[in-house]
Amino acid sequence: MIKRVNKLVLGISFLFLIISIFAGCGTGKEAEIKKSFEKTLSMYPIKNLEDLYDKEGYRDDQFDKNDKGTWIVRSSMSIQSNGKDMNIKGMVLYMNRNTRTTNGYYYVDVIEREDKGIHRDNEKRYPVKMVDNKIIPTKEIKDEKIKKEIENFKFFVQYGDFKDLSKYKDGDISYNPEVPSYSAKYQLTNDDYNVKQLRKRYNIPTNKAPKLLLKGTGNLKGSSIGYKKIEFTFVEKKGENIYFSDGLHFNPSEDK
């Protein structure tokens, strides 16, 4: 009887040890993912995007020694309600630190319903440039609504704030060392500062609080190969998807 009890105690102790080890690994990987994102997110908000001309990101052997690098800034909102087509609006800027010039495009995309076949050839791009922190179309736009959307567009990096990234805890952590890829997902509330900022700027057709997804590929310690992006997912199900995507990347320049 005593031997059975001892075996049972030993088995339970071993089980707790295994659980503790896995929990510790998860906590450690979560801290690594946060640290990887903090290098970029700690810069938010950057109200004047031209300040990025004087900021350098992570450099590795992919950069030419004379290349100051290019910042790629992107933000987009995607909305699909009640099985309708998905509408996406966003902007991408390429900020060349060598020439201190910025070009990019505003885009509007419609992804048709599944029963009609999903494809992206409905995307329309409107080329833009940035001068004195103002985004200006480089070609004539007759659609006044689009012109206004470009004029009023703000990137999330200009108003988002992740100074208190450590407050997000107990995330759903995923890590694949083979790719490598990694992610951390957190349930937010509608009282979260960044959620309030998004609702202030976009007509988001749901009262559900979003989940914050920090997702990336490449070396966790830093790499110019791969990507990092953040996503606020309000709704994610068949026929209804509402999410906001943002990214700030530092890459080698195509023209040195």
From Swiss-Prot:
Q: Write the signal peptide boundaries.
A: 1-24
Task: Report the PROSITE patterns cross-referenced here.
Answer: PROKAR_LIPOPROTEIN (PS51257)
Q: Which InterPro entries match?
A: Csa (IPR007595), Csa_sf (IPR038641)
Localized where?
A: Cell membrane
Q: Where is the lipid attached (S-diacylglycerol cysteine)?
A: C25
Coiled-coil regions listed in the entry? none
Keyword Nucleotidyltransferase among UniProt keywords: no
- Coarse class of the protein's main subcellular location: membrane
Entry's Gene Ontology cellular component terms: plasma membrane
The lipid modification N-palmitoyl cysteine is placed on: C25
Q: Which domain of life is it from?
A: Bacteria
To which protein family does this belong? Answer: Belongs to the staphylococcal tandem lipoprotein family.
Name used for this protein in its record: Uncharacterized lipoprotein SA0093
Organism whose genome encodes this protein: Staphylococcus aureus (strain N315)
